[in-house]
Amino acid sequence: MKIHFIGIGGIGLSALAKFLANDGHQISGSDIKQTEITNDLALNFGAKITIPHHADAVEGVERVIYSAAVRPNNPEYQRAKALGIELLSRKASLKTILGEKEVYAVGGAHGKSTTSAMLASIIPNSNALIGAISKEFGSNVRYANNNKVVFEADESDESFLNSNPYLAIVTNVEPEHMEYYEYDEERFYNAYKNFLTLAQIRVINAEDPFLASLDMEVIKLFPSKDITNTEFVLVNGTPHTKFTLKDLGNFEVFGLGDHIALDASLAILGALALGEKIENIRANLLHYKGIKKRFDIVQNKENCVVIDDYGHHPTEIKVTIKSLKTYQKLRGFKKLQVIWQPHKYSRTIDNLPAFVECFEGVDELVILPIWSAGELEVDIDLKGAFSRYNLHMADKVTRKDGVVQIIQDNNIITEYREDLITAFGAGDITYQIRGEA
């Protein structure tokens, strides 16, 4: 089938496109700009890519799948509708793509990409569709010629309800994307309950208050008592976490922090329930190498480490700051310098007090302009809100010859040459800190 994707450069839609290309479909797609992802699709998956969107791109295709960011006034959407081509949102398309598969779905407010990638490492003969790039297989997709699919299930638009889970793992539940749920908390929590109900096997973090309240048959992880002997170590300068899980013995995994042990433990319990052997699980977990943009070490010098992290919610950032302080101590760095690009005006406003708290313990904080993600601009006094910090307000950052430059009004206002530097955000900060912007 000829399938066209509007917004193919997004991490979620590109995963579906690659998966369907591997399944034998002829794919094409469009986006507003050329990126690493669109280049990969063109070079390695035979996709015809149109930049920017153009109505002619849908000529001759049989199905159009579009991202949540696409509006009805998009020229390709309009042309497809006029031509009577089948139009499916990403959410709606999941039913046709995953309907016949044995899906191992991972949901949750935080940690779902990490847990999904770990589960994919533990079950190496599975397909994988993840909302991030696994460093083990260098992609957000892995193809296996069978029915098993590790799938990162997205709650932001209730699309996880279309994921056909055989196994459902939920890391935690916290109100997010509430604009989609019309700020109706009951609807939000019911979506998670329904997601778990769909599955044959359910694994939960039983210390999450909402998950603990559910009356259904589940495999429960109690992190505070089931995970013991946690130890953080460096292996060739990279962070690893060692821990003991219940009576299953010792495990080691790439990454740093109690949350890493928690995510790994959920993946281990899920794999065990699927019938994987414990010694295979222990060995395969060591193949996990982290995921791009999560505690992602993009520069590793003896006197200066630069980390890129996708964290864009205060809970995520607070947990990662704790891990960064541990890593700082292990590496013997004097200072932790953090750059933050807030993501969405709505999220920044809804969580402002928590954002102010979550950077506690950093030595310097740089705040960049809010990445709008298509939202209308709102005036927020971030300089005033974060005045207690050693603060720099800047327009952008870049990295040249191992030096991170902080830029305001086209002038370099400060430079970071040593110690630990970390950039947080889900916008284009990842390209800035990598020196690719």
Regions found by a protein language model. Name each.
Residues 1-36, 42-49, 60, 64, ...:
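ATP-dependent carboxylate-amine ligase
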Residues 12-16, 112-118, 136-138, 262, ...:
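Short glycine/serine/threonine-rich phosphate/pyrophosphate-binding segments
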Residues 19-25, 57, 72-218, 271-272:
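Phosphate-binding loop of NTP-binding sites
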Residues 50-53, 89-92, 129-131, 206, ...:
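Beta-strand->loop->alpha-helix junctions that form or flank phosphate-binding loops
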Residues 64-67, 151-152, 170, 204, ...:
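Redox-cofactor binding/interface segments in oxidoreductases and associated redox assembly factors
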Residues 69-71, 111, 155-158, 174-176, ...:
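Short glycine-rich anion-binding loops that position phosphate/pyrophosphate groups of nucleotides
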Residues 162-177, 210-212, 252-290, 420:
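A conserved, hydrophobic alpha-helical segment in the catalytic core
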Residues 251-256, 304-308:
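Short pre-catalytic strand/loop immediately N-terminal to key active-site residues, enriched for Gly-Thr
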